[in-house]
Design a protein with these regions (language model features):
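Conserved glycine-rich cofactor-binding loop
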Residues: 12-13
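Active-site helix of classical SDR
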Residues: 122, 159
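Catalytic Tyr-X3-Lys loop
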Residues: 100-119, 163
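Active-site-adjacent segment of SDR/Rossmann-fold oxidoreductases
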Residues: 148, 169-181
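Rossmann-fold cofactor-recognition segment
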Residues: 47-63
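Conserved mid-core segment of classical short-chain dehydrogenase/reductases
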Residues: 82, 91-108, 127, 152
Length: 217
């Protein structure tokens, strides 16, 4: 019972892809969820003889993703694992600017991917691992924009602020349970990813803090 189970969302690019590569190990069982497969990750997993599977799922449809995750974890032999970790990393940006300049579908997807999906995936993860003897952990990848509002990305700020408060409430719930999961959120700071490129390349008219944001890199 030495294997560790890891479930990671948003593993196709950026920080999620980097985390996935760090988690590749013979005694880790990694399941990645993203809209697209990461072929480079698959090749590295094969070369390292590291168990890694990828689901191509749209987390803007989180009910289906959560149901699939719960059923899959429920099919595993809990006795074969020393512990289990869920990392909610996936996020979605709208176009940069006020919310009334964005499409309703963009705004909906930003909240579904950034907040509803972590909520439902965490619920599924906790249900499926409730009887596991080993430690359970949930890591929610947040952002400084969940703690400090910024013009031009209201939906992203709202999703990350909600994620932080969700984490606090979940941690209180799990603390009441015997062998409850440890739940934390982490704001990693400004990292060079496609998301940062999109923010820095936006129209300054809709992103008045662009210069300040760019200076943080």
């Amino acid at each position: 019972m030495t294997r560790q189970l890891f479930v990671l969302t948003g593993a196709s690019r950026g920080m999620g892809a980097a985390m996935a590569e760090q988690l590749l190990a013979a005694d880790h069982h990694l399941r990645c969820i993203a809209r697209h497969r990461n072929d480079a990750l698959a090749a590295k997993a094969q070369a390292a003889a590291a168990p890694c599977e990828q689901w191509a799922l749209d987390l803007a449809q989180p009910v289906e993703a959560a149901a699939r995750l719960q059923n899959w974890i429920g099919s595993l032999d809990a006795a074969a694992y020393a512990g289990a970790t869920l990392i909610n990393n996936a996020a979605a940006l709208t176009r940069i600017g006020p919310i009334d300049d964005c499409l309703d579908a963009e705004l909906s997807a930003a909240l579904r991917v950034g907040l509803e999906a972590p909520l439902l995936l965490t619920a599924a993860f906790l249900r499926a691992t409730r009887g596991w003897a080993g430690p359970k952990r949930v890591l929610n990848i947040s952002s400084g924009l969940g703690r400090r509002a910024m013009a031009g990305q209201a939906s992203y700020c709202a999703a990350k602020a909600g994620l932080d408060h969700l984490t606090r409430a979940l941690a209180l719930d799990e603390a009441q349970r015997p062998f409850g999961a440890k739940v934390v959120s982490l704001a990693p700071g400004v990292i060079d990813t496609d998301m940062q490129v999109a923010l820095c390349a936006g129209d300054p008219a809709g992103f008045p803090e662009q210069a300040h944001f760019f200076s943080l890199k």
